[in-house]
Regions:
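Beta-strand C-termini and the immediately following turn/loop, strongest in propeller blades
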Residues: 69-76, 117-133, 166-172, 191, ...
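Blade-loop segments of beta-propeller domains
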Residues: 55, 83-126, 131
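Blade-terminus and WD-like Trp-Asp/Gly-His loop motifs, strongest in beta-propeller folds
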Residues: 59-67, 114-125, 157-164, 240-245
Length: 245
């Protein structure tokens, strides 16, 4: 009888590959060890808590390469609830990988964290999303002054010059693409396929002023392959600003 083999997850894959130097196959260099071609790897977080960073398109390192951003929680293997808090920290690679907590967030997920990142073109500002009362917001923390400013909107992606960001409603994402949005605030348009009052907005990171660029209803009016899609469920996800913006 063929024995059932459970699907391999990322953690088990890393365990397996770390135990075997031959997993990644042939090497054309005669006599050279496969591991001699691998980049050096070391763990930079400590303790029993769980650490990670996301998303992969965000700036995790400061411009000097000394300071690394990370998130910390005390659980795994379940979906975050509205009550779960993630801790935000800076790791100093030149001081024995010292962890310094700089804040927390009530708006996060495993896939993309809380959009934690260094603000582009800045060597002192860090931004991440949070939930305060019944609103998703974003914080900008200055590592030199220790001061934090709070913007009235959550951000999704930041312009390359670090002056503005694009965002959308994370309650809508959580409703239609669970895991990529945030728990804690129900989607007020859960019964609408193409709401006209929410969409993509642009927010000035200095003034905090925001404006809607276009609504979900606006986008839904654009035909797909010559056919109307206004009867389908719509939301925005995976936003990114062009590098030459």
């Amino acid at each position: 009888m063929k024995q059932y083999q459970p699907g391999i997850n990322r953690r088990n894959f890393l365990k397996i590959t770390s135990m075997s130097p031959f997993v990644f196959g042939a090497n054309s260099n005669h006599g050279a060890s496969p591991q001699s071609k691998l980049a050096p790897i070391r763990k930079i977080t400590k303790g029993s808590k769980f650490h990670w960073f996301g998303y992969y398109d965000k700036l995790q390192f400061d411009p000097t390469g000394r300071y690394v951003l990370g998130m910390q929680v005390d659980f795994e293997h379940r979906t975050p609830t509205a009550q779960d808090i993630v801790k935000i920290g800076i790791i100093d690679l030149q001081e024995s990988d010292r962890w310094t907590e700089i804040g927390t967030s009530n708006a996060w997920g495993w896939q993309q964290g809380c959009m934690l990142q260094w603000v582009p073109k800045s060597n002192s500002e860090i931004i991440w999303n949070d939930r305060i009362d019944n609103q998703f917001v974003s914080h900008i923390y200055n590592v030199k002054t220790g001061l934090t400013s709070t913007l009235s909107k959550a951000i999704y992606t930041i312009s390359p010059n670090g002056k503005w960001a694009i965002g959308t409603e994370f309650s809508r994402i959580q409703d239609l693409r669970p895991g990529y949005g945030y728990a804690g605030i129900p989607d007020p348009y859960a019964d609408e396929k193409t709401p006209k009052d929410i969409g993509l907005y642009k927010i000035d990171l200095k003034t905090g002023k925001s404006k809607m660029l276009f609504s979900i209803a606006d986008i839904a009016k654009i035909p797909s392959k010559g056919k109307s899609v206004e009867d389908q469920w719509h939301w925005f996800n995976h936003l990114l600003v062009s590098p030459d913006s």
